[in-house]
Amino acid sequence: MMHLIIYAHPNKQSFNHAILQQTVQASNKLGVETVVRDLYNLNFNPVLSWEEVKAAGQGIIPSEIQFEQQLITQAKLITLIYPLWWMGFPAILKGYLDRVLTHGFAYKTDETGTVGLIHNKRMQQFITIGNNEQEYQKLGFDKSLNDCLINGLFNYCGIIDVRHQFFGDIHLIDEQARLAILERVEQITEQNLVDNE
C-alpha cells in the first residue's frame, strides 16, 4: 500500500508543515510506504500551457506529469494538505491538478457522457482556514467548497471516498489547540490507512 501526500504551502515554519509532519509520522508508524510531493520545494510549474493542452489531446504527456500520474495510480490513500486561499486551492496546487488530472488519465468522455477513471482510492484533505468553521457554515461556504473542491473535482474523476477536515482560526488558536489538531490529524490518518487496507 502506498500513501501519497500532496503538500502546498511555501513556509516550512507554517502550521501546515506541522500537519504534514504529523501525517507522515502517522503513516510511518503503520509501516506504510509514504511519498511526499512538496510542490513548492519541487518548484512545480503550475502553468498549463496551450502547447501542453494540444499535446495531451494527442496523448502526449510530459514525463514529469506522467510521473505524478503514476504516483496517483499507485496510491491507495491520497492526502492533500493546504491552506484555503481566496476560497480555493493555492495556485500551485490548482495548477498541479490542472496539469496532472488529464483527459484519458483522470476521466474520459464517451456516448454516455464523462466517466471518472481514478478508482479504488480514498482521499483525505487537511485544510487550514483563517476564519472559524462555524462562520463558513453560517455563510454556506462549506457547502460551496464541498460542491466545488470535492464533488465537482475529485468525484468527477472517480474518487468517490473523499474526506476533508477544516482547521479554523489557525492564526488565533493557542499551542494547546494546535497540539489537539495535530493529534486529530494523526488519528484521522491512521484510521483512513487502516480502513483502506
Descriptions of predicted regions:
Residues 1-105, 172, 176-197:
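N-terminal beta1-alpha1-beta2 submodule of the flavodoxin-like/Rossmannoid cofactor-binding fold
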Residues 1, 32, 121, 159-160:
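A structural micro-motif
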Residues 5, 34-36, 125, 161-164:
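Conserved beta-strand scaffold positions in the cores of enzyme catalytic domains, especially
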Residues 103, 107, 159-162:
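Short, structured loop/turn "capping" segments at alpha-beta junctions
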Residues 1-3, 128-131, 162-170:
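A short small-residue
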Residues 108-156:
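Short, glycine-/small-residue-rich phosphate/pyrophosphate-handling segment
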Residues 73, 91, 118-121, 160:
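Structured loop/turn residues at beta-strand edges in well-structured enzyme cores
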Residues 139-197:
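Glycine-rich phosphate/pyrophosphate-binding loop and the adjoining helix
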